[in-house]
Amino acid sequence: MAKPTYVKMDFPQELQDKALEALELARDTGKIRKGTNEVTKAIERGVAQLVIVGEDVTPEEIVAHIPALSDEKKIPYVFVKKQQELGAASGLEVGCATSAIVDAGKAKALVDEITQKFSALKA
């Protein structure tokens, strides 16, 4: 399957795994937002610390605005291969197009590490 048009760079599997781990930890010890509408609001309000987006979302238009909006607000984001994994990490039994960490809780160190790696990828 070809990469969706909104995925502008490749994210290493290690970074994807760390992002999902951080999301699970933040879900249990901090606060997260699930779903494209909630994540969009969190980005616009500047409260999102890390945004995680599924690459296999259809139609693409559902999440196509997330990377540009995140760049505009200088919020790091990571793409993961499957929205089913993202849903599971978010505490859902179904897939989830996007999730955001709003309060990292005990995942702060992981979020900081992911942010540094994201900055290096963007450079």
Swiss-Prot record:
GO molecular function list: ribonuclease P activity; rRNA binding; structural constituent of ribosome
Any GO BP: tRNA 5'-leader removal
GO cellular component: cytoplasm; ribonucleoprotein complex; ribosome
Xref: Gene3D superfamilies: 3.30.1330.30
Keyword Lyase (UniProt): no
InterPro entries: eL8/uL1-like, Ribosomal_eL30-like_sf, Ribosomal_eL8-like_CS, Ribosomal_eL8/eL30/eS12/Gad45, Ribosomal_eL8/Nhp2, Ribosomal_eL8_arc
Pfam name, any one: Ribosomal_L7Ae
Xref: SUPFAM superfamilies: L30e-like (SSF55315)
Keyword rRNA-binding applies: yes
Keywords, sorted A to Z: Cytoplasm, Ribonucleoprotein, Ribosomal protein, RNA-binding, rRNA-binding, tRNA processing
Location of the protein in the cell: Cytoplasm
Matching NCBIfam families: eL8_ribo (TIGR03677)
Biological function: Multifunctional RNA-binding protein that recognizes the K-turn motif in ribosomal RNA, the RNA component of RNase P, box H/ACA, box C/D and box C'/D' sRNAs.
Family listed: Belongs to the eukaryotic ribosomal protein eL8 family.
Binding partners and assembly: Part of the 50S ribosomal subunit. Probably part of the RNase P complex.
Record-given protein name: Large ribosomal subunit protein eL8
Lineage, opening ranks: Archaea, Methanobacteriati, Methanobacteriota, Stenosarchaea group, Methanomicrobia
